[in-house]
Structure formats: structure tokens, C-alpha cells
């Protein structure tokens, strides 16, 4: 590798916590399931010119492995089992599972293989893409600028929260996948550690090295895959919720609600699930409307909302988090996950709006029909129609 293209990643744990949480569940429950996933740039960025540099980084990723000190640290956490961690010790990224091409200027990436392996590509690969693009586009930007921006926003944050009881305000770093760089994310997290309301990070490598609490449960792909794993499509979301509880009966219990819209989720989230899960995570749609629906649902089921946690993680910044805190803090426990607005917030730097999402499970289509129309993902229109019918969804939202 050239110096300019030095490896972005230095640890297998430089990923989001929920990837390992889901990987263990897949390892135990769905060892032989195969999946395919695709990269999407939601903006108008033409990233195809970076295909060669990204391919080079993907080749370098096969040399990452779980180190002994990392293995020991994971072993001390309460939710990982020895059989999974011993398997993870032997895990290596397989670059043959990833195809990268420049499609008329657009970056085209497809991943396929056993779910237990493919599941780990998404977050580090997105972090690689983000960092490589910013290396080329913004060579003048640096860590000091990111820190200066954060300091300025923390001054505004202090003014915004003056006189406000912040004892129930909890903020997490969710910024791995679209960070400007690994160095920027670490610097930002170290600074936030000085604040009493900062409670952890989704990044396992940072959590280990900085003695932080790792944060995360499951992602859309857990629910998407069950659309083909479950023999009954209409029951697939309940099957996903139940399988998660089998793996994690009394921990990691924050459920993601928007794989097939919040309303469809709540119809499946009956009193048993609502009692056993510790809370819910918002990732699309109007956050106030979502939170009100969640609280009303708990109350309808006879569950005290104060005993549950709502996690907000959709396109948040500090100001939005405070607005939501003011609205909800007296009625429910709250946590806020901020990503891009912390780890890629530098003057004259345009963050990338990039994702990698599941598109197939065992050779058949899966879909994400979230509460934000632009986040809908699926190639197969017939399957989308079947999914809408199975979950009794209203008007059709335009897929992208």
C-alpha cells in the first residue's frame, strides 16, 4: 500500500457493537443462512472513482484478527458465550465475498456469503469508504478542526441546557460508519468522556481502549432476514423478536422499530415482548410522533413508560437531542445516539450519506420499509407488495 492509502482499520473490533451481538445470534441460530447486501449512496456523490482505493483497503482487511487482549476483554462481558468467541478468534474477512466496481461514476458494491461472516463487513467497510473519500477530497481537514467544531457546539449546548435538569440525559457515540477518520472519532469520543452525560460508544474498539460502555443491540438486517427465515411472512417480525430473546433473554433489549414501519411493529409488539424488552429505538420518521406512539402503546398495555427506555438515533445533533429531551424526559427514560454530526463535523467537509443494506436472504428478496420514504430499500416490487399486504400497510411509499 502507498502511504496515502495506508490501512484505515487496525482492529477487528473497530465496528459497531450490534454487529457482534447479531453475529453471535446468527452463529447460534442461523449458521447456514446465506445473504446478499448492497451499498447505497443516498446522496448525489459519484464515488466510483474511489473503487480501486476501496478495493485495496478490502484486501487489507483480511489480515485483521481478534487479538488476545481483545478476546479476554470480550470474554469478561456478560452476553458473549465461549463457543462464539472461540469461533470469532479464527474469523478472517474474506475479500472474495465483496465485489467493487465503478458503474458510470457510481460506486457499486455487493456482498454475498454466509450471514455469520457477511454480517461483519458493513460497518468497517462504510468507515473505510468514508475515510478514503475524505482523504482524497479534504486533505486539508484535520483532527484539530473537528475538535474546535465540537468545542463550539458544546458551548452552545451548555447555553441551551442552562437551568435544565440534565440528570436523565444520556448521549452515546454512534459515529463509526460515516466518520471522517478513525483518529477524528477517537478524539471526539475522548473529549465527550469529560461530560457527565456521555455514557458510551457503539464502537467496540474504542469502548475497550477507553474503558467505555459498548452500546448497541440489533439492526434492520435482523428483521429483514427473518422475512425469509420465517415460514410465515406476516409472523416474521414476531419471529425476529422472539429469536433475539432466546439469545439474550434479559439484556441487549432495545428493539428497532422501523424495518416495516412503527405502526406495523407495534401491532406485533404485544405485552410479552413489551414487558421483556427494555425499550425501543427510533431510526426514521418524525421522532416526536414516534415517541408519543411508543408511550401510548406502553400505557395501553399497562406498562409504566418510566420503566422503559426510548433511544433516538436518526440524524441527530445536540440541539435536536435537547429538544427531544425537553419533550419526553419527564415521562420515559431516554438515550440519544449521535453519529455523523459528531464524527464528521468539520468546516467545508460534506459527510457521506452511505449505507449497506441486506437485499437477499437464502436467495430470496428482503425489504426495509421504514417510516422515512427515502430509506425504503428493495429491488423486488412483487415482494414489497406481499410485505405490505402481510403487514396491512397503507399507501405505497416510493422506493429508492
UniProtKB/Swiss-Prot annotation:
<comment type="similarity">
    <text>Belongs to the NAPRTase family.</text>
</comment>
<comment type="function">
    <text>Catalyzes the synthesis of beta-nicotinate D-ribonucleotide from nicotinate and 5-phospho-D-ribose 1-phosphate at the expense of ATP.</text>
</comment>
<keyword id="KW-0436">Ligase</keyword>
<keyword id="KW-0597">Phosphoprotein</keyword>
<dbReference type="InterPro" id="IPR040727">
    <property type="entry name" value="NAPRTase_N"/>
</dbReference>
<comment type="pathway">
    <text>Cofactor biosynthesis; NAD(+) biosynthesis; nicotinate D-ribonucleotide from nicotinate: step 1/1.</text>
</comment>
<dbReference type="Pfam" id="PF04095">
    <property type="entry name" value="NAPRTase"/>
</dbReference>
<feature type="modified residue" description="Phosphohistidine; by autocatalysis">
    <location>
        <position position="220"/>
    </location>
</feature>
<dbReference type="Pfam" id="PF17767">
    <property type="entry name" value="NAPRTase_N"/>
</dbReference>
<dbReference type="InterPro" id="IPR007229">
    <property type="entry name" value="Nic_PRibTrfase-Fam"/>
</dbReference>
<dbReference type="InterPro" id="IPR041525">
    <property type="entry name" value="N/Namide_PRibTrfase"/>
</dbReference>
<keyword id="KW-0662">Pyridine nucleotide biosynthesis</keyword>
<dbReference type="InterPro" id="IPR006406">
    <property type="entry name" value="Nic_PRibTrfase"/>
</dbReference>
<dbReference type="GO" id="GO:0005829">
    <property type="term" value="C:cytosol"/>
</dbReference>
<dbReference type="InterPro" id="IPR036068">
    <property type="entry name" value="Nicotinate_pribotase-like_C"/>
</dbReference>
<dbReference type="GO" id="GO:0004516">
    <property type="term" value="F:nicotinate phosphoribosyltransferase activity"/>
</dbReference>
<protein>
    <recommendedName>
        <fullName>Nicotinate phosphoribosyltransferase</fullName>
        <ecNumber>6.3.4.21</ecNumber>
    </recommendedName>
</protein>
<dbReference type="GO" id="GO:0034355">
    <property type="term" value="P:NAD biosynthetic process via the salvage pathway"/>
</dbReference>
Amino acid at each position: 500500500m502507498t502511504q496515502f492509502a495506508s490501512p484505515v482499520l487496525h482492529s477487528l473490533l473497530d465496528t459497531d457493537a450490534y454487529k457482534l451481538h447479531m453475529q453471535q445470534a446468527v452463529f447460534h441460530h442461523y449458521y447456514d443462512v446465506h445473504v446478499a447486501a448492497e451499498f447505497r449512496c443516498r446522496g448525489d456523490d459519484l464515488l466510483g472513482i474511489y473503487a480501486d482505493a476501496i478495493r485495496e483497503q478490502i484486501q487489507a482487511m483480511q489480515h485483521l484478527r481478534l487479538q488476545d487482549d481483545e478476546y479476554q476483554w470480550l470474554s469478561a462481558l456478560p452476553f458473549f458465550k465461549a463457543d462464539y468467541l472461540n469461533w470469532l478468534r479464527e474469523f478472517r474477512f474474506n475479500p472474495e465475498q465483496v465485489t467493487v466496481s465503478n458503474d458510470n461514476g457510481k460506486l457499486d458494491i455487493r456482498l454475498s456469503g454466509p450471514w455469520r461472516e457477511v454480517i461483519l463487513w458493513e460497518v468497517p467497510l462504510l468507515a473505510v469508504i468514508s475515510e478514503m473519500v475524505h482523504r482524497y477530497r479534504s486533505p486539508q481537514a484535520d483532527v484539530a478542526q473537528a475538535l474546535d467544531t465540537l468545542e463550539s457546539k458544546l458551548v452552545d449546548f451548555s447555553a441551551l441546557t442552562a437551568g435544565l435538569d440534565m440528570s436523565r440525559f444520556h448521549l452515546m457515540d454512534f459515529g463509526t460508519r460515516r466518520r471522517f477518520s478513525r483518529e477524528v472519532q477517537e478524539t471526539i469520543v475522548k473529549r465527550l468522556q469529560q461530560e457527565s452525560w456521555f455514557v458510551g460508544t457503539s464502537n467496540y474498539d474504542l469502548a475497550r481502549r477507553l474503558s467505555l460502555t459498548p452500546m448497541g443491540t440489533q439492526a434492520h438486517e435482523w428483521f429483514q432476514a427473518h422475512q425469509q427465515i420465517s415460514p410465515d411472512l406476516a409472523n416474521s417480525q414476531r419471529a425476529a423478536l422472539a429469536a433475539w430473546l432466546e439469545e439474550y433473554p434479559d439484556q441487549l433489549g432495545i428493539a428497532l422499530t422501523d424495518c416495516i414501519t412503527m405502526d406495523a411493529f407495534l401491532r406485533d409488539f404485544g405485552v410479552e415482548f413489551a414487558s421483556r424488552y427494555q425499550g425501543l429505538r427510533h431510526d426514521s420518521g418524525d421522532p416526536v410522533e414516534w415517541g408519543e406512539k411508543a408511550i401510548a402503546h406502553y400505557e395501553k398495555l399497562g406498562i409504566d413508560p418510566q420503566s422503559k427506555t426510548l433511544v433516538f438515533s436518526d440524524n441527530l445533533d445536540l440541539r435536536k437531542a435537547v429538544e427531544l429531551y425537553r419533550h419526553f424526559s419527564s415521562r420515559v427514560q431516554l438515550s440519544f445516539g449521535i453519529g455523523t454530526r459528531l464524527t464528521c463535523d468539520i468546516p467545508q467537509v460534506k459527510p457521506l450519506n452511505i449505507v449497506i443494506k441486506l437485499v437477499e436472504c437464502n436467495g430470496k428478496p428482503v425489504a426495509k420499509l421504514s417510516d422515512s420514504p427515502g430509506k425504503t430499500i428493495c429491488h423486488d416490487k412483487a415482494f414489497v407488495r406481499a410485505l405490505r399486504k402481510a403487514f396491512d400497510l397503507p399507501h405505497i411509499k416510493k422506493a429508492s
